[in-house]
């Protein structure tokens, strides 16, 4: 398996974002009792943004962002970005099915 180049990663994240709405991220945060900062970090990871860029604009250190990410992952029960995306996709599909029933 070859690693993705930057263009492929960008295309993948753009495709991913079309399916993952802010509502789904909110559901995840509510379900797992994430803090506001943990919610923001999860959104950063899902968007494909880099902590370095966010730290520069947001005023939080990379270590702080990493700690918030680790805490969110522990609460959600995932151990890496891929597991997070799988979980968010699952939650998204579940939310879509529930919305279609109502």
Residue ranges: model-predicted function:
Residues 1-18:
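General nucleic-acid-binding
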Residues 33-34, 43:
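Residue-level marker of regulatory loop/turn positions in helix-turn-helix DNA-binding domains and
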Residues 49-82:
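Recognition helix of helix-turn-helix DNA-binding domains
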Residues 18-30:
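Short, Lys/Arg-enriched N-terminal segment that forms or immediately precedes the first helix
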Residues 45-49, 88:
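Short helix-to-turn junction characteristic of helix-turn-helix DNA-binding domains
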């Amino acid at each position: 398996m070859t690693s993705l180049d930057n263009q492929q990663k960008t295309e993948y994240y753009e495709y991913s974002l079309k399916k993952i709405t802010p509502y789904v991220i909110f559901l995840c945060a509510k379900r797992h009792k994430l803090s506001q900062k943990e919610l923001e970090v999860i959104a950063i990871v899902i968007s494909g943004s880099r902590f370095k860029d966010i730290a520069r604009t947001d005023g939080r250190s990379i270590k702080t962002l990493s700690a918030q990410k680790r805490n969110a992952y522990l609460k959600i029960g995932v151990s890496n970005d891929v597991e997070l995306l799988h979980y968010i996709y699952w939650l998204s599909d579940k939310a879509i099915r529930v919305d279609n029933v109502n």
